[in-house]
Each structure stands twice: as structure tokens, then as C-alpha cells.
Amino acid sequence: IGNMHSASAPPPDESTFFLHMIQAQLARSAQLVELPDHVGTLLSEPKNEIIVNFPVLMDDGSHRVFKGYRIQHNNVLGPFKGGLRFHPDTRLDECKALAMIMTFKCALMDIPFGGGKGGVKCDPHAFSEAELVRLTRRFTHALGANIGPEYDIPAPDVGTNAKMMVWIMDTFMNIGGGDRSAQQQRVVTGKTLECGGSVGRDKATGQGVVHC
């Protein structure tokens, strides 16, 4: 495959090295399987890059503005699918790289989903539970119709958990006019068992590392 990157793109620095590494791996793999040029070009960049800035009321009465991301890489095989991470080092380029990897993982295992990834640049350990509730709900509200059970389905990742997925689900259903049907509950995976989650989800990633 020829040059997938813009001629004006700056050389990778430490913060973008991961993304450039994944793009380079895609280019090498595309050559090996003789992937058509236009397919490689499409896969080298995400379909959508969503960046939101949203205010959150803190316990001391002040407001802080947080930056959140949702990268939707490719949905040819099915809805975008991938985790949400709350971490101080969450960056756009990191989310882009991880979303690409999700696309490839789903395709390799013949799972009918595409690749997505996102998160909020924050330290979740620095907040009270009440602040985390407000942050998660405000982020969900800011994403709005950019997620949904037939379009983009988030899941837990670094710094997030099953309880937060329930907060996302509840907020999403409220945004949708109060529709609390089973279909709307599928907006996220990794929920608590009491709210429709799956048995074994909390240790699935670790088991995958051990057995695969």
C-alpha cells in the first residue's frame, strides 16, 4: 500500500507513537494480504472523531470542565464497540489507536461489531462517588445520539466499572424520553448483573490474556 498518511502530517512524537505504530502495522499487514489501496486508506483513519467538553458540579460547589472522546473507527461489520476509560492520560490519538485495534479484533474473531473507543481525561480516584456519578452522566449527555444499542455500544475499560455502565444506561434512557425497554438497555455492555449484565464479564479480559 502506498502512503496512507497525509503528506503534511508531522512526524510522530511520544504522545502519538502508539497510533503511528498501529497505522504502520496496518500498512505492513495490508501489503501481505494484498489489500486494495482504498480499503487500507479507509482503515487507516476513524470514521468519526467525537470530542466533547462538558461541565461538572463538584462537591465544593465549583464547576470543572472535562474533555471527553469517542472514536468510531469502522462499522462495516456491525455497531461500533469498545470501552470507555477514565484516566489522566486519556488522549485523542490513544483512543484512535485503540478503536482501530477493536475493529481488527472483532473482524479476526468474526464478531459482528466494529471498533470504537473513548474516555474522559480525568483521575477517577480523585473524586467522590457523587462527583463520579455527575461526571459520567454529563459525559453521556454530551455524547447524546452518538451512542446507542444499534450504533455504538460502550463498555468498561481502565478507570470505569459496571456501576458506571449502569449510570450511562440510565442517563441514555432518560435522554431518549424515558424509554426503558430491554432494547435501550443494550446501549452498554459490562453492566451489573442486577441491571442486565453478563456473568463473568468482570474477569473476561484477564481470562482472555491467560488463555489466548
Residue spans for each PLM region:
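N-terminal ligand-binding/catalytic initiation module
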Residues: 4-204, 210-212
